[in-house]
């Protein structure tokens, strides 16, 4: 079967356009565009479209990038777990996204959807697979945001023809893949991660393609409602300090100059860090969060009904 590379390219570019258009409408600032290409004779040939935002009204920095590259020979280092593919011509294309909001109540997010093929040689056919996923990294997490993200991830798997077993496998894979062993903690609250979809020959091309693009198509429904809910900006010292705390794991020991102690988030007064462990939490429809993730005290009071402090 001839692989529909041109069709895949068009679909990845359409996904990039849709995401960037929606994010520009949300932020109010345009993404910068950089079209690039690799000339003939380079080890890697191909082209791509880089879309970047920096110092936006809402997003401090982010990128949504498309690339389509080809090579004449897969190096052995790239085929450690598939040594039989070494030396074969290859092709890879996909979309990758990272967004860092200014507001620490809004999480950083990552999305990647991709396709890879090691082309046929004299004796072997094409070997192809899809991969990707999306995951959320809150600085100041809220249970309802995490549940919404995971629920939409599950909806993506269902929309692509997958079942609950597939969803649980990809969710668990994401938790393992983004676990920081040197800190003995997860990076963020997870989401979906998958790779080698179709490589075993048990998943037809159309089914693997449908699942992969369902994940990409559910990125905006998974993320935009969260940032819209958390769009109002917190006090300036929270923006300046809390992002630094979570990006560098360094706390502050008191209010900023000119600040008032009553304005300090409770967690800063207690420990100088907003990090708390999330106990395991399962919703009625089976969404599980909290396998070692961190939960802010405001969320703990919300869960238990204690306290009356308003949420941001």
Question: Where are the model-predicted features located?
Answer:
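Gly/Pro-rich turn-and-neighbor structural signature
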Residues: 2-82, 204-251
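Residues marking helix boundaries in flexible regions
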Residues: 279, 288-290
């Amino acid at each position: 079967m001839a692989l529909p590379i041109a069709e895949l390219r068009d679909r990845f570019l359409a996904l990039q356009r849709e995401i960037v258009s929606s994010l520009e409408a949300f932020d109010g600032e345009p993404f910068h565009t950089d079209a690039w290409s690799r000339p003939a004779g380079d080890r890697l040939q191909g082209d791509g479209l880089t879309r970047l935002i920096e110092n936006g009204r809402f997003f401090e920095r982010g990128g949504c990038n498309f690339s389509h590259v080809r090579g004449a020979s897969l190096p052995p280092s790239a085929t450690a777990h598939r040594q039989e593919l070494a030396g074969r011509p290859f092709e890879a294309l996909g979309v990758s996204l990272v967004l860092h909001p200014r507001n620490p109540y809004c999480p950083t997010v990552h999305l990647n959807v991709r396709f890879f093929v090691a082309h046929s040689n004299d004796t072997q056919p094409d070997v192809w697979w899809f991969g990707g996923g999306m995951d959320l990294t809150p600085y100041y997490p809220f249970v309802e945001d995490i549940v919404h993200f995971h629920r939409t991830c599950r909806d993506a798997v269902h929309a692509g023809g997958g079942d609950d077993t597939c969803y649980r496998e990809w969710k668990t894979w994401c938790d393992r893949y983004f676990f920081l062993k040197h800190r003995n903690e997860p990076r963020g609250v997870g989401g979906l991660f998958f790779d080698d979809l179709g490589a075993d020959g048990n998943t037809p091309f159309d089914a693997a393609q449908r699942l992969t693009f369902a994940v990409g198509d559910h990125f905006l429904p998974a993320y935009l409602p969260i940032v819209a809910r958390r769009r109002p900006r917190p006090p300036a010292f929270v923006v300046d300090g809390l992002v630094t705390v979570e990006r560098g794991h360094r706390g502050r020991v008191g209010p900023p100059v000119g600040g008032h102690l009553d304005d300090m988030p409770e967690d800063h007064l207690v420990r100088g860090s907003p990090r708390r462990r999330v106990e395991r939490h399962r919703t009625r429809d089976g969404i599980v969060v909290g396998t070692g993730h961190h939960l802010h005290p405001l969320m703990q009071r919300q869960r238990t009904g204690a306290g009356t402090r308003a949420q941001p």
